[in-house]
């Protein structure tokens, strides 16, 4: 049985290579890849804001694969949690690519271009391999794209009434529009949270993200209509 079956609810847990070994050939995977030197520099700068001098323990091999070689002495609990999340993605069965820009173009199963903009995701987005298979995109890894210029976005935050009886109007508004401050290390942690919590309730993405936001001195992010205990 595939130990990552929960990430692919639309597939049989006994279905290796997503039942398509021609397109999805990497069963063991397990890397975060950042190809361009410019993007690697942006990533290093983000890690320095999260881990201070420990950011020097990150390195890339000739293929752009991210490694962490060093201890965690002196890191806070939140820093250790974020590093643990990064390591889990690096050691997972799936490959994850990270790049920086405004948009990315991928192919569908018929070879047609599909353009996805970071503005559609509030400054960053993640295409999970599970979603790519379901939508028949021709990709073989999780894809993270970060807009390095994004500084804020708006989300539809949920209130306590969101979890109550929707027919009871006395509970008040279920959602409200709120501004969310962003920066590059914050967005990286958020998107890594999506990879970590694929197939799980998406409040866990915010919980992970808020550990990084605390390190960065950003306000705690609220759950919203796309990230809450009812959303998978």
What are the residue ranges of the model-derived segments?
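Predominantly extracellular/secreted Zn2+-dependent metalloproteases
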Residues: 30-185, 198-232
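Short turn/helix-capping motifs enriched in Asx and small/polar residues
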Residues: 1-52
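Catalytic glutamate of the conserved HExxH
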Residues: 20, 184-187, 191-195, 199
């Amino acid at each position: 049985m595939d130990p990552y079956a929960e990430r692919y609810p639309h597939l049989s847990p006994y279905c290796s290579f997503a039942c398509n070994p021609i397109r999805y050939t990497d069963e063991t995977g397990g890397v975060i890849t950042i190809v361009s030197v410019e993007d690697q520099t942006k990533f290093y700068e983000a890690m320095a804001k999260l881990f201070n001098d420990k950011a020097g323990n990150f390195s890339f091999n000739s293929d752009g694969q991210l490694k962490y070689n060093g201890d965690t002495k002196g890191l806070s609990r939140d820093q250790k949690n974020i590093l643990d999340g990064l390591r889990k993605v690096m050691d997972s069965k799936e490959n994850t690519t990270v790049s920086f820009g405004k948009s990315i173009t991928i192919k569908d199963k018929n070879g047609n271009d599909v353009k996805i903009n970071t503005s559609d995701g509030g400054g960053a987005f993640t295409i999970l391999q599970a979603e790519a298979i379901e939508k028949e995109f021709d990709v073989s890894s999780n894809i993270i794209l970060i807009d390095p210029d994004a500084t804020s976005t708006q989300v539809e935050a949920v209130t306590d009434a969101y979890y109550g009886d929707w027919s009871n109007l006395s509970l008040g508004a279920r959602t409200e529009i709120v501004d969310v401050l962003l920066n590059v290390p914050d967005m990286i942690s958020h998107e890594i949270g999506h990879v970590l919590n694929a197939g799980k309730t998406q409040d866990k993405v915010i919980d992970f993200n808020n550990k990084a936001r605390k390190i960065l001195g950003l306000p705690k992010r609220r759950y919203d209509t796309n990230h809450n205990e009812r959303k998978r």
